[in-house]
Regions:
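Hydrophobic, well-structured mid-protein blocks that either form specific transmembrane helices
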Residues: 94-140
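Transmembrane alpha-helical segments that form the membrane-embedded catalytic/substrate-channel core
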Residues: 48, 107-120, 171-186
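Multi-pass membrane catalytic core of lipid/isoprenoid biosynthesis enzymes
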Residues: 11-16, 57-114
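Cytosolic, membrane-interface loops and tails of multi-pass inner-membrane proteins
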Residues: 1-2, 51-66, 117-133
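Topogenic membrane-insertion module of multi-pass membrane proteins
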Residues: 1-52, 176-195
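Lipid-exposed faces of alpha-helical membrane segments in multi-pass integral membrane proteins
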Residues: 14-20, 40-43, 79-82, 104-108, ...
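Helix-coil boundary and interhelical linker segments in multi-pass alpha-helical membrane proteins
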Residues: 24-39, 79, 83-104, 149-166
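C-terminal membrane-associated helical module and adjoining short loops/tails
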Residues: 127-195
Length: 195
């Protein structure tokens, strides 16, 4: 019997590295080092893109281990793709009443989406197993691509305009988290074979 609660095997390592990267992103954002904040957010997204494949490589997972994996992945995703982007945007300048309400709404939509995913995934695991082929709505991990791409605009836009445009961007992404539309999951094996 283990002296620690939880499940400890290689299947959770990338999830924990993703969390570590997201927390690092928040630290860098709070210090005004936005380049490294975005870099670590992207690293978090990269880890999240591959953690499912790592999990599926372990064939002898218990039902408790599977349930733990679903929960720990979503909890880490909430910090990585809910809190870290909101913290980044706050320190960049999405502030004031409107900005704070938008960031609150963004975090709320991320947590709703992740909780809904947990319910659907637990049901799906009992009936189907394997990898899911579609998302319901925009996955929270998408912010680790959307936000860095948007940040490229800071090199061509005045700072006040860049910050002003972050407001509707985060609002739109939040709505896309909870809007129910099918999004085909990218097949990483096919993507990597075409590179």
């Amino acid at each position: 019997m283990s002296r620690f609660i939880g499940f400890y095997d290689y299947t959770v390592i990338l999830t924990y590295v993703s969390l570590l990267a997201a927390v690092s992103s928040m630290f860098y954002a709070s210090q005004g080092n936005f380049f490294y904040a975005i870099l670590f957010l992207m690293l978090s997204g990269l880890c999240d893109a591959f953690d499912g494949a790592v999990v599926r490589s372990k064939k002898d997972r218990t039902e408790e281990g599977k349930a733990f994996g679903i929960q720990i992945d979503s909890l880490c995703d909430l910090i990585s793709f809910g809190m870290a982007p909101a913290v980044f945007c706050f320190f960049v300048g999405v502030d004031g009443l409107a900005g704070r309400l938008i960031l609150f709404f963004y975090c709320l939509c991320a947590v709703i989406r992740l909780a809904y995913f947990n319910v659907l995934e637990a049901q799906r695991q009992q009936t189907e197993g394997g990898a899911n082929k579609y998302y319901h709505g925009l996955p929270v991990t998408a912010i680790s691509i959307i936000l860095p791409l948007f940040c490229l605009l800071q090199h061509v836009l005045p700072e006040h305009l860049f910050v002003a445009l972050l407001h509707p961007l985060m609002l739109a992404v939040a709505f896309l988290f909870i809007l129910d539309f099918p999004v085909k999951k990218p097949n990483l094996r096919n993507i990597l074979s075409n590179v």
